[in-house]
Amino acid sequence: MNKLNVLIAGSTGYIGTQLVKLLCKHKNVKIKYLCGNTSVGKNISAYDKDLKKYKLPKIIKINYKLFKDVVVIFTSLPNGESQKISNKLLKKNIMIDLSADFRLKNSKIYNKYYGIKHISLNSL
């Protein structure tokens, strides 16, 4: 069986590093890209020493052109950021959001609790 190529956006926070640990142990997953904004060029092990034992790509800035190389895109980003990515997905992509952006199905309730207008209404 071919390994499933994944991209993790927001890989350096607590949720992101825990996800990296879990996926490193999965025999059918290949972490193709680790993405961040302020951590570009660094190794993920700078954020969690337990990850030193794995061969992982360096952190890069997210680029929507990368989506063609992966099937699954995990997002662990600040509120409001994952919805921007959802509008750029290809038909073959599956997005698993670990933030709050798609937690609620009603945009008015989302705005009330998070103070941000939801821009990806088709994905709710």
What are these regions, as identified by a protein language model?
Residues M1-L124:
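N-terminal Rossmann-like NAD(P) cofactor-binding subdomain of oxidoreductases
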